[in-house]
């Protein structure tokens, strides 16, 4: 495959995001809908797919102590700046939060069960009429903007039912045409300058981690760091990862570099690699190459599991990605990278997702632990053999199988998780 296609996919899948991306997506959609209509707000209606609704259900809104779909929509409408994309709530003020709390009776939320992929629709009614926005497939992919039933903007083909994926999604799907040996060959041989941009994720996510070490969220990252000695890069990796996620899910006003639409995925696919790089005094080039591998494996799996799913994509998809990156950084061969992925597939695949919340850092820690264990096993010639569980004869089928566990495998599980969350909130 043309290396420029791979590089473009990596660039496209990377994006700064403030807070968890699902409430940010709701806020962005609402901000854009209000932007085109303006006026005194009378009603806001949000229609979201079950996965997006679940992930935003109990997640903190950046810069506030508020959580959930309703507050994300209200704040997006009241103070969101759509030009900032997934950082649209960057300019939030205390008075905006106070105003939003007085308007909770003006919002309606509907779950759109019969939809494929990510979906959020915002309908904002004011004294000037109705503004409507639809986001599809990617968290910031606005495909329709209407003002009083007049189309102001529409992405060609994106609302056509026969076209299940946007052009952006089709591009990323090309990753699944690659064999693992082709992926590793790209990682080894691509000109460093062409992938140096991947280090931007390290800078951004490290700042978020430092914020989390102040004790935000459940304080797991801070707790782990306190028991970490100077040379233990595994515990250091867990601490960096968990503290960044602690900060993110608790609403810290610091962006993460997302990948495949998720800040947590972006954190897990990068910070454990930074931990190894720092503790072993490695150079930036080998770090960038390991990130490229981590990202590509994560993207590969996510193309089969979907952007949002019943399993914890952070621990499973991103965890598998970073396990390959860890093996690479520790000097692993192609065969050892393959065996690392087999070990991960046999370990935590199937861990459920209960949305973006304070428990995310706990699941992330499990994913990072499993990633290091899988790599160490492979580097010591320990591997789960083919035809054992979901491990297939080809590593590409094994990665596909990881995704298949989520979709279609766990679709009923996802529904039941959402039902439990809604019941528990009453």
Curated annotation (Swiss-Prot):
Q: Which GO terms describe its biological process?
A: L-cysteine catabolic process to pyruvate
Tell me where on the tree of life, at the top rank, the source sits. Answer: Bacteria
Q: Quote any Pfam family the record assigns.
A: SDH_alpha
- InterPro entries with a match to the protein in the record: Ser_deHydtase-like_asu, UPF0597
GO-annotated molecular function? L-cysteine desulfhydrase activity
The UniProt entry's sequence similarity note says: Belongs to the UPF0597 family.
Q: Which PANTHER family match?
A: UPF0597 PROTEIN YHAM (PTHR30501:SF2)
HAMAP family in UniProt: UPF0597 (MF_01845)
Report what the protein is called.
UPF0597 protein CBO1815/CLC_1757
What species was this sequence derived from?
Answer: Clostridium botulinum (strain Hall / ATCC 3502 / NCTC 13319 / Type A)
Q: What is the lineage of its organism?
A: Bacteria, Bacillati, Bacillota, Clostridia, Eubacteriales
């Amino acid at each position: 495959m043309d290396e420029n296609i791979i590089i473009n996919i990596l660039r496209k899948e990377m994006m700064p995001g403030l807070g968890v991306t699902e409430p940010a997506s709701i806020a962005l959609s609402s901000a854009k809908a209000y932007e085109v209509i303006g006026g005194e707000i009378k009603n806001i209606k949000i229609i979201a797919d079950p996965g997006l609704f679940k992930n935003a259900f109990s997640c903190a809104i950046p810069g506030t102590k508020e959580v959930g779909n309703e507050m994300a929509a209200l704040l997006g409408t009241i103070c969101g700046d759509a030009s900032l994309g997934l950082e649209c709530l960057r300019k939030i003020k205390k008075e905006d939060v106070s105003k939003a709390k007085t308007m909770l009776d003006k919002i309606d939320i509907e779950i759109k069960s019969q939809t494929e992929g990510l979906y959020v629709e915002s309908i904002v009614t004011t004294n000037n009429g109705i503004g409507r926005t639809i986001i599809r497939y990617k968290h910031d992919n606005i495909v329709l903007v209407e003002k009083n039933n007049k189309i102001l903007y529409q992405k060609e083909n994106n609302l056509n039912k026969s076209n299940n994926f946007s052009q952006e999604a089709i591009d990323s799907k090309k990753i699944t045409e690659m064999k693992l040996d082709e992926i590793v060959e790209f990682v080894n041989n691509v000109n460093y300058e062409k992938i140096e941009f991947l280090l931007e994720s390290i800078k951004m996510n490290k700042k978020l981690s430092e914020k989390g070490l102040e004790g935000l969220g459940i304080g797991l990252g801070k707790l782990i760091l306190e028991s970490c000695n100077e040379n233990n890069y595994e515990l250091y990796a867990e601490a960096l990862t968990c503290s960044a996620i602690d900060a993110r899910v608790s609403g810290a006003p610091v962006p993460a570099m997302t990948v495949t639409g998720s800040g947590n995925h972006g954190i897990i696919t990068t910070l454990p690699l930074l931990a190894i790089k720092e503790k072993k005094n490695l150079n930036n080039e080998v770090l960038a190459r390991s990130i490229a591998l981590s990202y590509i494996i994560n993207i590969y799996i996510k193309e089969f599991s979907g952007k949002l799913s019943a399993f914890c994509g952070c621990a499973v998809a991103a965890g598998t990605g970073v396990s390959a990156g860890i093996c690479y950084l520790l000097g692993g061969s192609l065969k050892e990278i393959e065996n690392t992925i087999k070990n991960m597939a046999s370990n935590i695949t199937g861990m459920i997702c209960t949305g973006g919340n304070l428990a995310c850092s706990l699941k992330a820690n499990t994913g990072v632990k499993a990633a290091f264990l899988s790599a160490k096993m492979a580097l010591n010639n320990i591997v789960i053999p083919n035809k054992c569980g979901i491990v297939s004869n080809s590593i590409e089928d094994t990665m596909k199988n990881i995704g298949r566990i989520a979709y279609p495998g766990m679709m009923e599980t996802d529904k039941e998780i959402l039902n439990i969350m809604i019941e528990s909130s009453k």
